[in-house]
Amino acid sequence: MKHKLKITILSILFGLLFGIPVYADSNTYIIDQSDVLGEYISTLNEKAETISEEAGLRITCMITNTTEGMGTPAVSEQVYKGLFADDPGFMLIYSIDDQEWFIYSSGMESAPLTEEQENELWNEFAIQDYYVDCVDAYLDAAG
């Protein structure tokens, strides 16, 4: 318990230090800092929670405008650990302004998606801006 609290506090401090807002609880699976998911956020969050419970993993996603120069790997690890410590699972992160995405893996040896699925997601995110469909497809593939 102390370890989880320590990681949460450190993650919040790093988030404040580097300007990356970290504000979510452990029941939040979809973080939409860019407000591109709109009315679909609660439905996607419920779906992610259900898939996570069924799989015994944390399946999460974060969309942000920018990583403030930290990069998607660093931000996804920071946010994931702040929410779930070392629980096994995955986090898809996409930075709109940076045109960069990454799938962070905690306690797992492989990513939940095939290379073909990753390419399809990238096309939807970066080229077509189908954010809701992309997050939904990620959840389906990860589950």
Question: PLM features: residue spans?
Answer:
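A structural boundary signal for the start of the first folded domain, especially the loop/turn
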Residues: 2-143
